[in-house]
Swiss-Prot record:
The chain crosses the membrane at residues 13-33, 82-102, 115-135, 161-181, 190-210, 242-262, 277-297, 317-337. It catalyses: a quinone + NADH + 5 H(+)(in) = a quinol + NAD(+) + 4 H(+)(out). GO terms for cellular component: plasma membrane. This is NADH-quinone oxidoreductase subunit H 2. GO terms for molecular function: NADH dehydrogenase activity; oxidoreductase activity, acting on NAD(P)H, quinone or similar compound as acceptor; quinone binding. The gene is nuoH2. NDH-1 is composed of 14 different subunits. Subunits NuoA, H, J, K, L, M, N constitute the membrane sector of the complex.
Length: 341
């Protein structure tokens, strides 16, 4: 009996415990990232932002969470109730499940699989189903239009993100996220990370990640001036909160992906003491926050694109550019003898 427990049940209990701990830490982090997003936006507009609940407004996100939970969920009379309530849950669960393969430090990962990048790309692609379900089940024209926009937008920019991943794959020879970080470990520190040799792809990834997560200036799915609140028009209370939570988890996931692919993951910027004394998870968190700051600044200073401009940028600019970079990177690696063995 003891052997059965140690062989079969104990690994399962460990994985469940790791997953619960990761989700709790991630949700608490999301609360403060949401607050930081509002504070950055306020600072750009020369105002103070949330500053009432808690010291310096640090508890504002938790107050908003409590308010949302205590509200009554309103369901439109013509809505498909089951699909309507399932949509935000699908969006949130898919966003959280991507973190199962993301290493936050050396050995700090729930599932260190060899197709980690492919897994994250697949899970992020599936998140569009939550938006489509919400748009269709609401029985309203604004959410339905937003769902159609979301499907087209995500498909358009996932192609570019796929080519970005192929460029990194050519340099590393593996889709394992830990291997990608270790491949950037060199005596050059920050200059040895892939953001420098693959800078055009870093820019393509950054802009495509904005579009993939429906962030400004590509928030056509939630364009207030056109679609009121987009696919969330009919949502309130806890379902609305789950959509917001899923959106910000997806944003942080993309920031973590950018950190791993281009910014060296948990590696220190200078591979010498005292920088090497700092735990890897601290460097990883700082780099994710830097990526999120870039996301927040785009929201604050860049005007929204028109829908036709969004599609043109994805198909006529990023797709040819990323495809050309794949060819160039492959050629340079082959003829310079730098291809991974």
């Amino acid at each position: 009996m003891a052997d059965f427990f140690m062989t079969n049940l104990w690994p399962l209990i460990v994985v469940i415990g790791q997953s619960v701990l990761l989700i709790v830490v991630l949700l608490i982090s999301i609360a403060y990232i949401l607050l930081a997003d509002r504070k950055i936006w306020a600072a750009v507009q020369i105002r103070r932002g949330p500053n009432v609940v808690g010291p310096w407004g640090l508890l504002q996100s938790f107050a908003d969470l409590l308010k949302m939970i205590l509200k009554e969920p309103m369901i439109p009379s013509g809505a498909n109730k089951g699909v309507f309530l399932l949509a935000p849950l699908v969006t949130c669960v898919l966003a959280l499940s991507a973190w199962a393969v993301i290493p936050v430090s050396a050995g700090w990962v729930i599932a260190d699989i060899n197709v980690g990048v492919l897994y994250i790309l697949a899970v992020s692609s599936l998140s569009v189903y939550g938006i489509i379900m919400a748009g269709w089940s609401s029985n309203s024209k604004y959410p339905f239009l937003a769902a159609l926009r979301s499907a087209a937008q995500m498909v358009s920019y996932e192609v570019s993100i796929g080519f970005v991943i192929i460029c990194v794959l050519l340099c590393v020879g593996s889709l394992n996220l830990t291997a990608i970080v270790q491949a950037q470990n060199s005596q050059w520190g920050v200059l040895g990370w892939y953001w420098l040799p693959l800078f055009p792809m870093f820019v393509v990834f950054y802009v495509s990640a904005l579009a993939e997560t429906n962030r400004p200036p590509f928030d056509l799915v939630e364009a207030e001036s056109e679609l009121v609140a987009g696919f969330m028009v009919e949502y309130s209370s806890t379902p609305y909160m789950l959509f917001v939570l899923g959106e910000y988890v997806a944003i942080v996931t993309m920031c973590a992906m950018g950190t791993i692919l281009f910014l060296g993951g948990w590696l220190p910027p200078v591979p010498y003491a005292p920088f090497t004394w700092v735990p890897g998870i601290v460097w990883f968190a700082l780099k994710v926050l830097f990526m999120f700051f870039m996301f927040a600044m785009a929201k604050a200073i860049v005007p929204r694109y028109r829908y036709d401009q969004l599609m043109r940028l994805g198909w006529k600019v990023f797709l040819p550019l990323s495809l050309a970079m794949v060819v160039i990177v492959a050629a340079v690696l082959q003829f310079a003898g730098l291809a991974p063995k």
